[in-house]
Amino acid sequence: MARVTVEDCIDKVDNRFDLVLLAAHRARMISSGSQLTIDRDNDKNPVVALREIAEQTISPEDMREELVHSLQKFVEVDEPESDTVPLIGSAGASVDADDTEVAVERMTEEELLKGLEGLAPPEEQPEEDE
């Protein structure tokens, strides 16, 4: 059994931390039944994963993609362009309709201050000691 070291793999994967992540992910894949690309030689899954990386029987870029997909909680979905899909609220309206015709009631500063004067602050509740 040949000993696999980080130096055997570091020229294939530049960062040691990435190497550990990729090897661990590959070892989990092997544990879940993924096909081996080299002979096991009575080695455990992490050693087999490192040997596969060192012998370049698997692509580190493919492993990185698989790792990212396995860690994603939400799958990205390409949304259709907004100009090709009509808006939900505009069933009878055309796509080119101008949405700036929203009626907004304007309030002057004096009206706002009069409204605020009518508001009373909430009553303070006495704190209970335990």
UniProtKB/Swiss-Prot annotation:
Presence of the UniProt keyword Nucleotide-binding in the record: no
A single GO cellular-component term on record: DNA-directed RNA polymerase complex
Region of interest called Disordered, as start-end residue ranges on this chain: 79-98, 108-130
Keyword entries, A-Z: DNA-directed RNA polymerase, Nucleotidyltransferase, Transcription, Transferase
SUPFAM superfamilies for the chain: RPB6/omega subunit-like
Role description: Promotes RNA polymerase assembly. Latches the N- and C-terminal regions of the beta' subunit thereby facilitating its interaction with the beta and alpha subunits.
HAMAP family in UniProt: RNApol_bact_RpoZ (MF_00366)
Subunit structure: The RNAP catalytic core consists of 2 alpha, 1 beta, 1 beta' and 1 omega subunit. When a sigma factor is associated with the core the holoenzyme is formed, which can initiate transcription.
Protein name as catalogued: DNA-directed RNA polymerase subunit omega
Biological source species: Nitrobacter winogradskyi (strain ATCC 25391 / DSM 10237 / CIP 104748 / NCIMB 11846 / Nb-255)
High-level lineage: Bacteria, Pseudomonadati, Pseudomonadota, Alphaproteobacteria, Hyphomicrobiales
